[in-house]
């Protein structure tokens, strides 16, 4: 928090989002809320990688006019767009961090790209479960999508999970193999 405040004229952040791959326990929720002052919204989100859900993208249908008959929506040739999300309850949403992306093909920016297409033709979403925080899912999903593109160790377009989970898991493995590192303070970037 001190590092943030030094770079922001002493201000505290308006919002802090904490990701975890297991559910938040009551004492963890209370500790997170107690760690920040009243001016900071604390959003606690469990990110579940494996779900049984899939999604199908449809082309829009057309209304008939004059002699032209109506056309029903039909499955699209490409999967759900990356960034699509669907709330399934007030505290849960499905988010597709993998999927069809426009604008990355240099020869034709209108061409859909789906990098997992050969191995997994239909992308599956991740399940987001909110334990603290409020509002809609748009800001939460956009922040998470941004974090799926921040893996500095490869040149892929995106990962399925955000770096907040990928690198914390990797860091835990390193500490498990080198327990003497626990007592020292290191820049987290050294472990990326």
What are the residue ranges of the model-derived segments?
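Long, contiguous domain-sized segments
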Residues: 1-192
């Amino acid at each position: 928090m001190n590092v943030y405040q030094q770079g922001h004229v002493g201000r505290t952040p308006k919002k802090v989002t904490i990701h975890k791959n297991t559910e938040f326990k009551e004492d963890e929720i209370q500790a997170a809320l107690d760690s920040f002052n009243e001016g900071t919204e604390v959003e606690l989100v469990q990110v579940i990688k494996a779900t049984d859900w899939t999604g199908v993208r449809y082309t829009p249908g057309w209304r008939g006019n004059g002699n032209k008959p109506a056309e029903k929506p039909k499955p699209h040739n490409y999967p759900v767009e990356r960034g699509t999300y669907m709330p399934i309850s007030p505290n849960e949403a499905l988010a597709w961090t993998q999927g069809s992306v426009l604008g990355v093909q240099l020869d034709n920016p209108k061409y859909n790209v789906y990098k997992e297409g050969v191995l997994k033709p239909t992308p599956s979403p991740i399940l987001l479960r909110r334990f603290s925080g409020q509002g809609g899912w748009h800001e939460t999903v956009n922040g998470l999508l941004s974090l799926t593109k921040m893996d500095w160790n490869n040149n892929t377009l995106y990962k399925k999970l955000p770096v907040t989970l990928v690198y914390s898991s990797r860091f835990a493995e390193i500490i498990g193999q080198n327990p003497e590192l626990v007592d020292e303070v290191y820049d987290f970037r050294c472990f990326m």
